Amino acid sequence: MMDMLQLPSNIQAVLSTTVQFLGETFTLDDLVLHIAGRRGKPLHILEHPLDAATTGCCLALIDADIIIIRAGLSPSRYLNTCLHECAHFLLHHIPQVTAGAEQWTVETFLEDVNFQNVRRRTSMYDKPCEDAAESLATLLTLHIANGDMSMPLFARNLYK
């Protein structure tokens, strides 16, 4: 069982603040709006073909934040990937504008995007950042109200 005392304090604080703001149960859309409000710009989730080794990535543009999810994922994998990328924003792993994207707006990004460059540019997290995002994403899953896409009861009990 996962005890809140075993979590790093930054993950505890982000989870507590998020649940305090959104309530014990919330949707992915609620979480996306919460992140957008905290960062002061919209957060868009896009699906696109990505390499098999990459299920998602995120970056910050001048006027919006973007999460790119590999097209064709199962609903549960899609949710887990979205939550992982959302966790990067919540944990401040993503600056207000991603290095190299200082000139990109949503419009210019969508017109002339090179997803290989995007993936390379957004795959520079060190292992602790990835571990922290995965831990927070797993805990956020416990609060997501998405019916069949939420974590099964037996798995939820592992984290209580």
Model-assigned labels for residue ranges:
Residues 79-102:
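Short, internal acidic amphipathic alpha-helical interface segments
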Residues 41-79, 89-92:
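Active-site scaffold of zinc-dependent metalloenzymes
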Residues 2-37, 96-160:
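Metalloprotease/metallohydrolase-associated module, dominated by Zn2+-dependent proteases
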